[in-house]
Each structure stands twice: as structure tokens, then as C-alpha cells.
């Protein structure tokens, strides 16, 4: 069975709980990502998304007022806008289980934790990479417990 650890991103970008939403916004923009795990040290505390940040801005500010937006972003911490109850998985979680969680919760990523420590992240892009590799989640989940036939994986 294919485990999350085989396809997860191990070099995880994250923000600290006391970082400003401006820092989170810049990291997301620079790396073209939509969410960041929030940590204290290496312990997962929550997750912040581009939508969390966007929703924090007063509507009137979203009309091209860059200086005000920057000032506002520096005055709030990630902790004030993040999601605390994070759906996460462990490195040995079957990939098919992670895919089901992504779909069920309609989220773009799952932090991967081991003993509370953030060790990776599995994203929709990682799942697409798996699919493009030519393997099938159905084949992987149905083969559990079956022996290989004719030398085929």
C-alpha cells in the first residue's frame, strides 16, 4: 500500500503562530501556494489559507489601496485568522485515505505530522504527481493483502 510519506512534500513552508498575515501573504505569493501550516517551533498549531487572509480584510480595503492593505496585514497575526482544528495525517497513512480526506473536507492540503511534529505536507498537486506516475489509487487500495502476479508490481 502506498503511504503518504512516499509522495508528500518534505521541505514544508510554514509560518509561526505570531507571524503577521503580511508575512504569510508574501510567502504564499512568492511560492505560489494557497495555504501554510502554522507552527510553534516544529509543532503543528493550525493552518492559514489565502482565503483566511482575504476574509480578514475589510471589504472597502480590497479596492486597490495597497499601502492600507500592507499596513493592515502587518497589524494582525496569523493566529488571529488561522484554522485551529486542522485535518492532518501521519506519514504511514495510506495515500488513498489522504485523498478521501482532501475530498471530504474540500481542502487543498493535509499537514503530515509525527508525534505532533510537522514532517511534511500532502497536497492536491502531490496527488496529481502520483496519478501522472501511472499508478492508480484503485489498484493500490484493492491490492492490499494480495500477492503480486507474474512479476508485475
Residue ranges and their predicted role:
Residues 1-11, 49-87, 99-103, 123-153:
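Tandem CBS (Bateman) regulatory domains
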Residues 15-32, 39-40, 79-80, 88-106, ...:
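The conserved cystathionine-beta-synthase
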Residues 29-37, 56-58, 63:
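Short, charge-rich amphipathic segments
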